[in-house]
Amino acid sequence: MRRSTPAATPVAEASGTGGGSVRIHYRRPPDRLQLLEQAVVEDDGRCIVTWLPSAQLTKPVMAGGRVVLEPGAPVVWFTWRGDVWHDVGRFHLADGTFTGFYANVLTPVVMDGAEWETTDLFLDVWMGTDGEVAILDRDEFDAALDAGWIDAPTAARALAEAERLAADACAGTWPPAHVREWTLERAREAVG
């Protein structure tokens, strides 16, 4: 698996502004590939904020027995350069109601200009607006490991990442302030 490095080609000049779009090659073992296109709303040289105006889902995303993302709902995504093993989404309902923060544990994103590539490692971390923190999809992760879709070192790194994010959320240090500051309204204003 290729990894992102700090020398990877930036999506936009790191000026604090965005512009343009990215196409994400999002792999999920064993053989699923999704191509996702999102508008870049900010690129500060370390974190790229992207906007997905309408989540293309076949069913709602659930956490803690509640719907946290509906088909057609907007999402503000945060993806970091370098050796970062997760991204973060600010999740909403279709009417724009904020529901919480969702981290996908994944391989570091390889960024080649506006083309990105990453592999989902099954685990997710959820922090709802009520402060609930949970590691999600452990059953899918265990099944993928048993099937040989993820090797043992990658699985260990993924589990450590999920546990660290959950612990940081419980301690009040995750998500970072930059993520908390990017509200749905701010993202909508940034894309015009």
Question: What positions do the PLM features span?
Answer:
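Charge-rich, low-complexity N-terminal segments
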Residues: 1-73
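A generic local secondary-structure boundary/capping motif
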Residues: 11-12, 37-39, 111-114, 123-124
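Short, well-ordered strand-loop elements centered on a beta-strand within folded domains, enriched
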Residues: 48-51, 97-104, 132-139
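A short, polar/proline- and glycine-enriched secondary-structure boundary/capping micro-motif
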Residues: 59-64, 113, 144-148
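Phosphate/ribose-recognition catalytic cores of enzymes acting on nucleotide-derived substrates
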Residues: 67-110, 116, 120-123
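A hydrophobic, small-residue-rich beta->alpha segment in the mid-to-C-terminal subdomain
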Residues: 121-166
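Cysteine/selenocysteine-centered motifs that mediate thiol-based redox chemistry or coordinate metal-sulfur cofactors
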Residues: 160-192
